[in-house]
């Protein structure tokens, strides 16, 4: 004979948001569960601009691998590629390729969102400015001030968006 414990509250989940970039990649990890959302860690992974492209991509891979081993996320959110300037877009696309490969090596399949989807999820307006999104992140995570740097704040916003869209 056995008993089954059925609970309406989901187990806590560590959700990692990633804001891709070659020079600076933002990351933000939250703990989500019945008690709400709590920040775990956030910051940036940087690659020196004076290094060659292969060296920068290797640094991104190694540092992200280490971060994944430390944080052990259950879910990952990733910003979809957004076109800025052609040169910048190519570098971000190369970084995204490394990010996707690194996630796959850690058996993680990211959920992807456009910047407008993230803004809509946090503020209710898909064209909200950076300040409004950062204020929403601070409010949702009960932070005493706006999260910095901007890339880390964006990554936290992506992680929160994963949580908001968990049943869609």
Curated annotation (Swiss-Prot):
Mg(2+) 2 binds at residue 79. Mg(2+) 1 binds at residues 19, 151. Its main location: cytoplasm. One of its GO terms (cellular component) is cytoplasm. It is found in: Cytoplasm. Signal peptide: none annotated. GO terms for biological process: DNA recombination; DNA repair. GO terms for molecular function: crossover junction DNA endonuclease activity; DNA binding; magnesium ion binding. Its EC number is 3.1.21.10. The active site is at 19, 79, 151. It catalyses: Endonucleolytic cleavage at a junction such as a reciprocal single-stranded crossover between two homologous DNA duplexes (Holliday junction). CDD domains: RuvC. Binds 2 Mg(2+) ion per subunit. The keyword Cell inner membrane does not apply. Its cofactor is Mg(2+). Homodimer which binds Holliday junction (HJ) DNA. The HJ becomes 2-fold symmetrical on binding to RuvC with unstacked arms; it has a different conformation from HJ DNA in complex with RuvA. In the full resolvosome a probable DNA-RuvA(4)-RuvB(12)-RuvC(2) complex forms which resolves the HJ. The RuvA-RuvB-RuvC complex processes Holliday junction (HJ) DNA during genetic recombination and DNA repair. Endonuclease that resolves HJ intermediates. Cleaves cruciform DNA by making single-stranded nicks across the HJ at symmetrical positions within the homologous arms, yielding a 5'-phosphate and a 3'-hydroxyl group; requires a central core of homology in the junction. The consensus cleavage sequence is 5'-(A/T)TT(C/G)-3'. Cleavage occurs on the 3'-side of the TT dinucleotide at the point of strand exchange. Belongs to the RuvC family. This is Crossover junction endodeoxyribonuclease RuvC. It comes from Synechococcus sp. (strain JA-2-3B'a(2-13)) (Cyanobacteria bacterium Yellowstone B-Prime). The gene is ruvC.
